Regions:
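Electrostatic, structured charged patches in enzyme active sites and in nucleic-acid/phosphate-binding
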Residues: 1-160
Length: 160
């Protein structure tokens, strides 16, 4: 009795989108979605800066107590007592202080495990620093970028 060939039980890997020319106005953009958003903001003559500002959402510090941490690829823990804990920074994709908006494009990113907590910390930073009147957008595709641009244009017309 012959056996049937086994099916491949592993999932096929999703292919990431091929990147084309991602250079605009001398700036190297990181994804097709960022490029599309950049082009749309320019087309609608909306004032913005691309990755022009980095926010420090938590200052660095030194932990005064005993601190051991695991080491990559080794079986033992390393003594990190007294070592500096680095600051936590966040750089949004598009910022406009004039029009009060921040856009963070998030396409298909398989392992952005730090983004959700970093984003929550950033929201707290905005509230604590009197920037809670900014419009925030996290579009994941071109349709959502279009919706983002429409919302910004609509809000700018209201304020004039």
């Amino acid at each position: 009795m012959q056996r049937k060939p086994r099916k491949n039980l592993t999932r096929p890997r999703k292919k990431t989108a091929k990147t084309r020319n991602l250079r605009r106005d001398g700036k190297q953009l990181k994804s097709n979605l960022e490029t599309y958003c950049y082009d749309q903001l320019k087309e609608f003559d909306i004032d913005f800066v691309y990755e022009g500002e980095t926010f420090i959402i938590q200052d660095g510090f030194r932990y005064p107590g005993i601190y051991y941490k695991s080491t990559k690829g080794k079986d033992f823990m390393m003594n990190a007592t007294g070592n500096a804990v680095l600051q936590v920074k966040y750089t949004p994709d598009f910022v406009s202080h004039k029009d009060k908006f921040i856009i963070e494009t998030k396409g298909y990113v398989p392992s952005q495990h730090t983004f959700p907590i970093r984003w929550k910390m950033f929201l707290k930073y905005l509230v604590d620093n009197g920037m809670d009147d900014y419009m925030l957008f996290i579009p994941k595709n071109k349709k959502q970028v279009d919706e983002t641009i429409q919302t910004i244009c609509r809000e700018l017309k209201k304020s004039k």
